């Protein structure tokens, strides 16, 4: 089970999303996503991460005079099971993982690229995913 989406965002925050068919995990064929309901929950999560990170990077670049023209994210979601995981104690145990490859386009120095990469970790969605969040669910009274 694995999923892949690619997000591109220009300096005007125009965002495009492409996704691989989640039922064909070995396929690299991507299709344009026109509506969020075309994505699985994992695809929606990755789209949130990439889109949010893109906004953070473009906003930072604009405020600091960095010539960031476009940013794209190639995101892969997968589960790593105990047989592939040295830290998992039980064979039924797995860890969930998102790999995010960030590509930056523009007239950027190495220093600009390093700064933008550091800033990418300040995206609120990235923080929630890496730090965790408590969710308190209950039935509302009628």
Model features per residue range: what roles?
Residues 1-47, 58-142:
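Extended beta-strand/beta-hairpin segments
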């Amino acid at each position: 089970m694995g999923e892949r989406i690619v997000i591109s965002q220009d300096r005007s925050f125009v965002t495009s999303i492409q996704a691989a068919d989640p039922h064909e995990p070995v396929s690299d064929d991507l299709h344009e996503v026109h509506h969020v309901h075309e994505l699985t929950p994992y695809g929606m999560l990755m789209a949130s991460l990439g889109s949010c990170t893109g906004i953070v990077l473009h906003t930072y670049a604009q405020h600091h005079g960095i010539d960031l023209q476009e940013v794209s994210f190639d995101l892969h979601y997968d589960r790593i099971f105990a047989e592939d995981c040295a830290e998992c104690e039980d064979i039924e145990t797995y860890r969930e993982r998102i790999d995010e490859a960030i590509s930056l386009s523009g007239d950027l120095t190495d220093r600009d690229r390093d700064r933008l990469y550091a800033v990418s970790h300040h995206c609120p969605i990235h923080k929630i995913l890496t730090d965790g969040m408590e969710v308190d669910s209950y039935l509302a009274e009628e």
